[in-house]
Every structure is written in structure tokens, then in C-alpha cells.
């Protein structure tokens, strides 16, 4: 009886939702709506209210028949208002950095009212507040700098850019040298994303202010390295791509950073970490050269597949993470294997997340206090 009642209620809810979606949109009368933190300066929408509801509006072509909103990979049917504009009011399916697109008769279109970020192309995204993740909010603490650093790559035959975070005290303590973390992005991003989307600098500032992290330098390089004549249209795992990065990273990027920044140039004070493809780089290049990197962080980038390559005399920590909706059992098994072989290894599983930025922000937050101790 209870089963039939629940099914009837579910069917009634679906019917009401469908009927509501098909009707004319009636704008809310409450004036408690305000622009979101991700709404473009000139735009009126999206808006958010105190109940955490988000209001999206889009002017589709007059010929549009079927309009939906894709919000954090969940589709919501849109309604037209009296002026012919399409509207959706919905609560966010997930917290953190989320994709928003309009689907107009099957075509996916960025929301023109939102800021654009780069991830496998330019996308409209929105930042959904997460009270339990306050560690990446800007606070009244000393702030470091993020510097745009250029160096010439003979391997590529062109100038390359890296972003370098230096702690707040860096310029005021010219005689001090610092540990360094080389932090890599994923296949869909570039060297800007760890600071722009991942909030790496803010996370480091807050942890340093709490005395949970030794002041450090963070270097963010681009994963992609192409020799002259290489097919740039190939995907990240193209022939020799990994080897190209390895050579550039070890023979050009590292020496250049050590020549221009006051880093401590030994394995005990050098870490490597990355998300997704950057985690795969850490698990290959970092592991193969564990004589150079004492601290390794693999975020949603697989696991250490060949522990025999790890140097027991230099490796201080192997840290593997993923979202709970990815492959936590595989990580936990690999970490147990590494511990059995005598390595200091640890894992972290981000609750309720998948292959996404909230997983990687949390992973960095968990990783940083463990290194250079």
C-alpha cells in the first residue's frame, strides 16, 4: 500500500511539474532577489534569493519551440513570460563551480548573463556558495602575489607562460628561501585555472595565516608541450606528448624557476601535484623522478601504477584523492599497497562530488598542510 501511495505521489509531482513547465511564467513578486557573484556586470540575470533559489532568464529566437536550462548537468524545463523570455527558477543541484547552458531546440548555448571561463572551450559558469568549504573564501589575512612568468622553450621554439604564487612575506624577506610546489591543471584547462577557478592562492593564503602551511612558492605550468611540426589537434595523450612535457618540465621549467625564484632546490622541499591529466603527469613524471620530488599529490588522476619506481630515500608522501562519485575503492586499495611497501601514503575522498573543481579544491586544501613538514 505504501509503495503504491509513494508511486502515486511521485506521478502527481511529475504531472504538476510538467503542467507548470507548460504554462506561462509568472515572475515572483518578492523583491528579495539579487545578482549572483558570477553575473556579468552589465547583466540583470541570473539572480539568487535568500532561500538559495536561482532565477535564470534567456531571450531565445521567436521560432524556439523547446527551451531548457542545463544547470550543473541537470536539465530544467523553461517557461515563457508575457514578453516571450524564457525563465527557470531552481535550486542548485550542487555547490561550487558549475556549468550553465541553455538548450534551445537541441542546441546548447552559453548563458550570456554569466562570466565565461575556459574548460575545453569557453563556457558560462556560476559559483554556488558552499558553507562547509569556507577555506577558499577571501579573508582579511596577508595575501601573496600571483606573478605571470615567461620563459623561452627551445623544445617548443616559443615563449611559455607559467603562473607563480609567492607568499605574502616573499618580498620583505629577501634572504629567505622557500619550498616549491609544481601544480598542474587538467586536460580541459590551462595554466590559469588553478588560480582563477581552483582558488589555489586564496587557499594557500588562508592556510599560511592559520599556521597550518609553511610559506611556499607554487608554480603552475601548462600541461601541453608541442614540438615544431607536431599535430596540435591531437588530444593530450598523443604520441610522445608525455615525453615532451617531461623534457620541457625537467630541463627548462625547473631550472628557470630555480634561477629566478628563491626556492630550495632539493627533493625534501620540492613537491608535484595535479588534477586529472595533471595528476596523471604527477603519477608518471613525478614518480619516475621521485629523486627530485619528495611530495606527490594525484587528484582524480589515477593511482601510482608502478610503486617500484618510487625512491624510498626521497619520497616523503604520496597523496591520492578523488570524488566519492569517482573511484574511491581503487585509491584506498593503492594507498594500502603503498603503505605495505613502506611508503608514507594517504588518501582523501571528497564527499558528494565527481570529476569536478569542488573535488580538486578540497584535495588541494587537504594536501597542502601535509607537505614540507
Predicted regions located by residue number:
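Bacterial N-terminal signal peptides
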Residues: 8-17
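Non-catalytic cap/lid and distal C-terminal segments of serine-dependent acyl enzymes
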Residues: 22-75, 80-373
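Bacterial N-terminal signal peptides that target proteins for export
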Residues: 1-9
Amino acid at each position: 500500500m505504501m509503495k503504491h501511495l509513494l508511486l502515486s505521489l511521485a506521478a502527481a509531482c511529475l504531472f504538476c511539474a510538467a503542467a507548470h513547465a507548460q504554462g506561462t511564467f509568472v515572475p515572483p513578486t518578492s523583491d528579495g532577489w539579487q545578482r549572483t557573484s558570477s553575473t556579468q556586470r552589465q547583466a540583470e540575470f541570473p539572480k539568487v534569493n535568500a532561500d538559495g533559489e536561482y532565477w535564470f532568464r534567456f531571450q531565445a529566437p521567436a521560432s524556439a519551440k523547446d527551451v531548457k536550462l542545463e544547470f550543473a548537468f541537470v536539465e530544467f524545463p523553461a517557461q515563457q513570460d508575457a514578453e516571450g523570455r524564457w525563465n527557470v527558477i531552481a535550486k542548485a543541484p550542487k555547490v561550487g563551480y558549475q556549468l550553465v547552458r541553455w538548450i534551445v531546440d537541441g542546441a546548447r548555448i552559453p548563458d550570456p548573463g554569466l562570466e565565461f571561463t575556459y574548460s575545453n572551450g569557453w563556457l558560462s559558469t556560476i559559483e554556488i556558495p558552499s558553507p562547509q568549504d569556507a577555506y577558499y573564501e577571501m579573508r582579511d589575512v596577508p595575501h601573496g602575489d600571483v606573478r605571470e612568468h615567461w620563459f623561452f622553450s627551445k623544445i617548443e621554439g616559443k615563449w611559455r607562460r607559467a603562473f607563480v604564487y609567492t607568499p605574502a612575506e616573499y618580498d620583505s624577506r629577501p634572504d629567505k628561501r622557500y619550498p616549491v610546489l609544481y601544480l598542474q591543471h587538467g586536460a580541459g584547462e590551462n595554466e590559469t585555472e588553478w588560480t582563477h577557478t581552483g582558488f589555489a592562492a586564496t587557499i594557500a593564503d588562508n592556510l599560511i595565516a592559520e599556521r597550518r602551511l609553511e610559506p611556499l612558492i607554487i608554480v603552475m605550468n601548462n600541461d601541453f608541450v608541442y614540438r615544431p611540426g607536431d599535430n596540435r589537434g591531437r588530444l593530450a595523450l598523443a604520441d610522445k606528448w608525455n615525453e615532451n612535457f617531461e623534457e620541457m618540465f625537467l630541463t627548462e621549467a625547473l631550472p628557470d624557476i630555480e634561477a629566478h625564484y628563491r626556492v630550495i632546490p632539493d627533493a625534501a622541499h620540492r613537491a608535484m601535484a595535479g588534477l586529472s591529466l595533471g595528476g596523471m603527469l604527477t603519477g608518471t613524471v613525478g614518480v619516475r623522478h621521485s629523486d627530485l620530488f619528495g611530495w606527490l599529490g594525484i587528484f582524480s588522476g589515477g593511482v601510482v601504477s608502478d610503486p617500484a619506481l618510487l625512491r624510498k630515500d626521497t619520497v616523503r608522501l604520496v597523496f591520492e584523492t578523488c570524488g566519492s562519485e569517482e573511484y574511491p575503492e581503487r585509491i584506498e586499495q593503492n594507498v594500502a599497497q603503498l603503505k605495505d611497501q613502506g611508503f608514507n601514503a594517504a588518501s582523501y575522498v571528497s564527499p558528494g562530488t565527481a570529476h569536478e573543481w569542488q573535488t580538486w579544491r578540497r584535495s588541494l586544501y587537504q594536501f597542502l598542510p601535509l607537505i614540507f613538514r
